[in-house]
Amino acid sequence: MAPLKSLLLGASLATLALSTPLATDAENLYARQFGTGSTANELEQGSCKDVTLIFARGSTELGNMGTVIGPPLCDNLKSKLGSDKVACQGVGGQYSAGLVQNALPQNTDPGSISAAKQMFEEANSKCPNTKIVAGGYSQGSAVIDNAVQELSTTVKDQVKGVVLFGFTRNVQDHGQIPNYPKDDVKVYCAVGDLVCDDTLVVTAMHLTYGMDAGDAASFLAEKVQSSSSSTTSSSSDAASSSSAAGTSSSGLSGLSSFFGGL
């Protein structure tokens, strides 16, 4: 007998095959109205921005941003923070977004995880001052989940927030990303989306996450803004301490002169 996940994967393939034309039509309409299509390479091909969004699409989706949630998430984030402040980058390369990879132990394959990890590392090396946020949908949620876990401490500290839609590792990882701050992760699992329950059964609810784009963008924007406030506060505290130290040093210098330079 074939493993349960293999049987479910076959059923899901049929479901996704039927849904793809509808998703493509919706994506084309969205791109014409708002601008972001199924591919975005603003980190790789553009200049550094204050914020960089790294996104991994779901299985069988087009481009490197997909159609269901990637493009509207990008546009909503730009709307909240400023279109000139945000660079959107989809995960491509070795990440082919194939279906069979969902049945692997990490719900994706090592090459896909490596492709996402490289995007985070490129953001860090090319734009060391950018604030990184990330998102993933369906298999892409597993790609981002696993990639963030593998980041060095330096790069991971640059990641301010993550949103995961139709999280395929929701059960295994307890609704969070291991070894990453739980408060900086928001998981979206629609009622009736069985993918979030450790199955590979794709229902209609798995295709509804576009409606969460605004809320998810607000979450990421808040994480970016709160990290900026923390940085400003730390800088102010450091400046105050430096000023106080300078005053103390001046006083000691005066005493030193008075006593002949002890």
Curated annotation (Swiss-Prot):
According to its UniProt record, where is this protein located? Secreted
Give the active-site positions: 138, 193, 206
- Positions of disulphide bridges: 48-127, 74-88, 189-196
Which SMART domains does the entry mention?
Answer: Cutinase (SM01110)
The UniProt keywords, alphabetically, are: Disulfide bond, Hydrolase, Secreted, Serine esterase, Signal
Q: Which GO terms describe its molecular function?
A: cutinase activity
Q: What is the top EC class of this enzyme, as a single word?
A: hydrolase
The feature of type site (Transition state stabilizer) is located at 59, 139
State the coiled-coil residue ranges.
Answer: none
Q: Which domain of life is it from?
A: Eukaryota
Indicate the family of this protein: Belongs to the cutinase family.
Name this protein carries in UniProt: Probable cutinase 1
Q: From which organism does this entry originate?
A: Aspergillus niger (strain ATCC MYA-4892 / CBS 513.88 / FGSC A1513)
